[in-house]
A protein has these predicted regions:
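C-terminal helix-rich "cap/oligomerization" subdomain common to oxidoreductases
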Residues: 20-21, 78, 88-90, 245, ...
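Contiguous beta-strand/loop segments that form the cofactor/metal-binding neighborhood of enzyme cores
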Residues: 200, 206-285, 322-332
Length: 358
């Protein structure tokens, strides 16, 4: 089917799918902290996206968002009732608010991008999934480390079977988060709003592990709070051992008690046909690759980590997240959601099962 549309003085025939591709996707960002501003910046840079609103409970003047000449709202309800045309709400608020705000946006007809984690409990994550299905809206979970060249490469290696059977996987996450991060009056470190170290700092790497090797079982864990007493309501370190449902065994060693700056986020894989270690501060470089009948290709450089002044985060790949949202909602036939709501829910499930052993 083709439609007649007028462009200037000309009337042309076009396909409805083409009209959808030409339409800019309208984004509203709720939560204008470090990561919310990153979302706003990436939306304005994408040629297929348009930033139409910002929202935060703090006064606009305190947020450093002068570059964005769009309407500003002090609550999600006020935003959703404003009459502004919105295709996507980007939820960049404290972790404990993600699920409820995502559901509220979906119920009013918006698609949603949820920063990690999508929820702090499996029950709340399931409610987001239910709302997405009930109202037929897409929910995109932000796990931007999937876009880093080493992640793309190792995913292809695992899925192609080149590594053979997976024997052992060791995930190490050693970062610094101290009083420069856990500030008085902030939500970081709060049990209800933050949720814990695995949710806030290391869910990206648990997502990569799940993406590559699937679910885990037979979990054993030990936890410690070495130097965050009075700063957080939870552990700063842990040792976790488990089996993979698909075969093989794994471990996770993590800590935010590292002095002064991040040390590493790495994954070591021992498999039937070889071994690989991906390392760096946020799994941004292949440090070791020795695989049967295989020569390691040169990979594109990974984007640098998000820079928050005294502390650093994961790779600056939010541009890929926004591009994926635009292409999916514009009807690109070859595009699928990079991290869908079911995968986001699975990461919450894994972390909840680990924390249940405290």
């Amino acid at each position: 089917m083709r439609l007649r549309v007028r462009r200037g003085d000309k009337e042309i025939l076009t396909h409805p799918h083409r009209m959808l591709m030409d339409k800019k996707i309208k984004f509203a960002v709720i939560g204008c902290g470090h990561i919310g501003k990153r979302h706003a910046e990436m939306v304005t840079r994408d040629p297929g996206a348009e930033l139409v609103a910002l929202c935060d409970i703090r006064p606009r003047e305190e947020l450093g968002i002068e570059a964005y000449d769009v309407p500003f709202f002090s609550s999600l309800m006020e935003l959703l009732q404003s009459g502004i045309s919105i295709d996507v709400v980007n939820v960049c608020t404290p972790n404990g608010l993600h699920a409820a705000m995502a559901i509220q946006a979906v119920e009013t007809g918006c698609n949603v991008v949820i920063e990690k984690p999508m929820a702090l409990t499996l029950a709340d994550a399931e409610k987001v999934v239910y709302a997405s299905l009930k109202y037929r809206k897409q929910v995109f979970c932000v796990m931007q480390n999937r876009y880093s060249p080493p992640s793309v490469w190792i995913k292809e290696m695992v899925d192609s079977g080149r590594l053979g059977k997976i024997y052992m996987v060791q995930l190490n996450c050693y970062w610094n988060r101290d009083e420069r991060y856990y500030k008085p009056g902030g939500w970081h470190g709060d049990a209800a709003l933050d949720g814990g170290t695995l949710f806030t700092q290391f869910s990206h790497f648990i997502d990569i592990m799940y993406w590559l090797f699937g679910d885990i079982c037979n979990i054993q864990a030990r936890f410690a709070d070495f130097n965050h007493a009075g700063l957080t309501a939870f552990e700063d370190s842990g040792l976790v051992n488990f089996n993979f449902v698909n075969g093989g065994m794994g471990s996770l060693s993590y800590s935010t008690s590292v002095w002064n700056r991040n040390m590493e986020s790495s994954m070591l894989i021992v498999a039937e046909n070889g071994s690989v270690k991906i390392g760096g501060q946020y799994m941004n470089e292949v440090e070791y690759c020795h695989i049967k009948d295989y020569e390691m290709p040169e990979l594109a450089p990974t984007n640098p980590g998000n820079d928050y002044g005294p502390y650093k985060g994961s790779a600056q790949n939010h541009n890929f997240v926004i591009r994926n949202v635009v292409r999916v909602l514009s009807g690109a036939s070859s595009e699928c959601i990079t991290t869908n709501v079911l995968e986001g829910m699975k990461v919450v499930d894994i972390i909840q099962r680990i924390y249940a052993l405290k």
